UniProtKB/Swiss-Prot annotation:
GO terms for biological process: DNA-templated transcription termination; transcription antitermination. Belongs to the NusB family. One of its GO terms (cellular component) is cytosol. This is Transcription antitermination protein NusB. PANTHER family: ANTITERMINATION NUSB DOMAIN-CONTAINING PROTEIN, N UTILIZATION SUBSTANCE PROTEIN B-RELATED. The gene is nusB. InterPro entries: NusB-like_sf (IPR035926), NusB_fam (IPR011605), NusB_RsmB_TIM44 (IPR006027).
Length: 145
């Protein structure tokens, strides 16, 4: 199945944030490398820029929002899980136009693509709790049918 431009953007953002978490390179350096990455030409560049630079800029705030939904310190998560959860937290807080179920599904798919064998289950559970806190009206409406 062909990937959407938005999915491609999220995949590239995951790769960039993974690199940032491990190397602490500047967002400009990571951005420059991503521009040469396979699939960049098919990505939604505005979304990629918003996610990559937004997560790096607001890292501390996103970690604060995410931490209460975790069952362990964030630094004990794999870099892939951290990157995916930070992207989803950013989208839940800044891209209200994207339904929370889409944000969670995209994060689960990213975790399946890049993470360990069961990492996607953890990502799903964390984001389900987080979405209920960050978007209570939307999640409640969904649960009430």
């Amino acid at each position: 199945m062909k990937k959407s431009a938005r999915r491609q953007s999220r995949e590239l953002a995951t790769q960039g944030l993974y690199q940032w978490l491990l190397s602490n390179a500047s967002s400009g350096e990571i951005d420059a490398q991503l521009r040469g990455a396979l699939g960049y030409d098919k990505a939604d560049k505005a979304l990629l820029d918003a996610i990559l630079h937004g997560v790096i800029r607001e890292h501390a705030t996103l970690v604060d929002a995410l931490t209460p939904s975790l069952d362990r310190p964030i630094d004990q998560l794999s870099p892939v899980e951290r990157a995916v959860l930070l992207i989803a937290t950013f989208e839940l807080t800044h891209h209200i136009e994207t339904p929370y179920r889409v944000v969670i599904n995209e994060a689960v798919e990213l975790a399946k693509t890049f993470g360990g064998s069961d990492g996607y289950k953890y990502v799903n559970g964390v984001l389900d709790k987080l979405a209920a806190k960050l978007r209570p009206a939307e999640t409640q409406a969904r649960r009430n049918g």
